Amino acid sequence: MSGGSRIQLLSPRLANQIAAGEVVERPASVAKELLENSLDSGARRIDIEVEQGGVKLLKVRDDGSGISADDLPLALARHATSKIRELEDLEGVLSLGFRGEALASISSVARLTLTSRTASASEAWQVETEGRDMTPRVQPAAHPVGTSVEVRDLFFNTPARRKFLKAEKTEFDHLQEVIRRLALARFDVGFHLRHNGKSILSLHEAHDEIARARRVGAICGPGFMEQALPIDVERNGLRLWGWVGLPTFSRSQADLQYFFVNGRAVRDKLVAHAVRQAYRDVLFNGRHPTFVLFLELEPNGVDVNVHPTKHEVRFREGRSVHDFLYGTLHRALADVRPEDQLAAPAAVPELVRPTGQQAGEFGPQGEMRLASPVLEQPRAPQQSFSNGGSGAGYQYQYTPRPSQPLPAAEAQAVYREFYKPLETGAAPATALPESQGDIPPLGYALAQLKGIYILAENAVGLVLVDMHAAHERIMYERLKVAMASEGLSGQPLLVPETLALSQREADCAEEHAQWFQRLGFELQRLGPETLAIRQIPALLKQAEANRLVQDVLADLMEYGTSDRIQAHLNELLGTMACHGAVRANRRLAIPEMNALLRDMENTERSGQCNHGRPTWTQMGLDDLDKLFLRGR
């Protein structure tokens, strides 16, 4: 700043244009602000008309409560709002808008016309303003009860801003995404969109489970609903409900992720971290989960006044929210079994309402307890094939998950039976029961293909199983259970490693000393900015302890929790499971294949191997008929 410059007040027009830089980024930003105002007014139907991606025209019309003639000029003034009056109102605000900046910012960079009528008024009133003229003009108009806002020629008076706009299709795609998010947030409101005179979207009000599921399917695609798991869990004043996509319906981009807090669409790093943790064990590298989730909590438990766009929020009890989200999603994904994936997609599947440990109640990090109840399967007669023949070590029966976890050594010993050479004399094949109700979800084995795949028949048709991937997941889950039950043993270091940290990091390490100790670490503070690592988990003796502790402390300060140590341990267990699992070209007898299928049905996350690859797939009779043109 030059020495001769004097401090002076900015003109209202310039101040609004500066504010518009934060609030109005593109036509989608305008649509968001106008639609939120319509929803706050109690509208039950909103019509959106767009031309040229929203740059030439963006018109939003609703049937809400309307604005009185006396309030129309104030509606375009900065920091004028009907949503809050006192600071206490801000702490518990439930409306989508409350800052009183949107219309003033929009009118400073576009030609804006607002027409409104209340139920008690005999006629409607209209106010107009343009970017170069901030003085509003009020006049009578014809309009039903409700409000229409027409925004023309966006950024007409700021050519530099207009140059940064993308192609018409790109801008319209962003605008559509805003409408989709709000349509998911408010099932009780109808949304109707037209672009360049063509109807693009028509969503009617959805007041029941079937209608809500249809709306989600219309927005996210029918494939999502076919591969989605409904959840509804409530605990300690927090409720999470919605739909989470199965790992088999992952995406290459994070473009099908919708998260709402008290009806407000948000993008929050704490939420993203919790979801990423929950899916970490089942997603293939580089893939992203899909979900439509709604978190409900007391309004004073979340601060929405963090950013002008209100996309970011701050939770008062961030650690509790994180653990609740992670635990709920982790448990829901773990409880998915083959029969859940085989079930025909209903209009509204039964909601999953787990309780206790199934509701996401976990012990301290590193001591996660897997649920012990078993999926009840119809029991077939227990025919034993463990007669020293090719099926030695296995029994052909339903094998529920053990109520007491197996020790790691025993779990591995059992599966070493896979490596025993096959003896001559084939075991008897199993015929399918006459009643389809007696057929287990993955059916009964028919044959083995190229020593890699198991072919089985179930009530739906043909099941193909990657035996190595499936066996790998079974061993991995049993090793995790064994480790959780036996605890983590520590390995003292002959020469303790010193670690230079900031004072804040050292304080964090001291605060979480017991947490580290449960995971096999022993940390000692030597000074204000120095730690000594005296012991590490025995399984991690090859790991870089310094870097791992630093990364964990960074997570603890950012999210209040960390799963890095557990992730390292799981990686080692996964390697053990991979090397211990049955290899390709290993010939299995029919009883061995059936035993593997039964174990898959009773193993958590059996649909994916440790690396996120699918372990099995289903081909129905309809799919097979299409291959051979049957029925045409």
Curated annotation (Swiss-Prot):
Similarity-based family: Belongs to the DNA mismatch repair MutL/HexB family.
GO CC terms of this entry: mismatch repair complex
Described function: This protein is involved in the repair of mismatches in DNA. It is required for dam-dependent methyl-directed DNA mismatch repair. May act as a 'molecular matchmaker', a protein that promotes the formation of a stable complex between two or more DNA-binding proteins in an ATP-dependent manner without itself being part of a final effector complex.
Entries under Pfam families matching the protein: DNA_mis_repair (PF01119), HATPase_c_3 (PF13589), MutL_C (PF08676)
Bilayer-crossing regions: none
Protein name as annotated: DNA mismatch repair protein MutL
Entry keyword set: DNA damage, DNA repair
The UniProt record lists the keyword DNA damage: yes
UniProt cross-references to NCBIfam families, sorted A to Z: mutl, PRK00095.1-2
Any one GO molecular-function label of the UniProt entry: ATP-dependent DNA damage sensor activity
GO biological process: mismatch repair
